[in-house]
Amino acid sequence: MDHRLLEIIACPVCNGKLWYNQEKQELICKLDNLAFPLRDGIPVLLETEARSITADESKS
């Protein structure tokens, strides 16, 4: 994941900052507790594709 990309993309739900979870290959929105998948290195920033995460998961 190119960290320059993280500087310009935002959560499609709240427009907040996204955090990269390399282990799970997901982009995390800590405000909405959502995890957006990466497929073949491409972020899938669709609310319908996101999974809900616990507050503990969003802290890591």
Curated annotation (Swiss-Prot):
Signal peptide: none
Organism: Citrobacter koseri (strain ATCC BAA-895 / CDC 4225-83 / SGSC4696)
Species lineage: Bacteria, Pseudomonadati, Pseudomonadota, Gammaproteobacteria, Enterobacterales
Family that this chain belongs to: Belongs to the UPF0434 family.
NCBIfam families on file: PRK11827.1 (NF008806)
Superkingdom of origin organism: Bacteria
Protein name: UPF0434 protein CKO_02153
HAMAP family from the UniProt entry: UPF0434
Gene Ontology cellular-component terms listed: cytosol
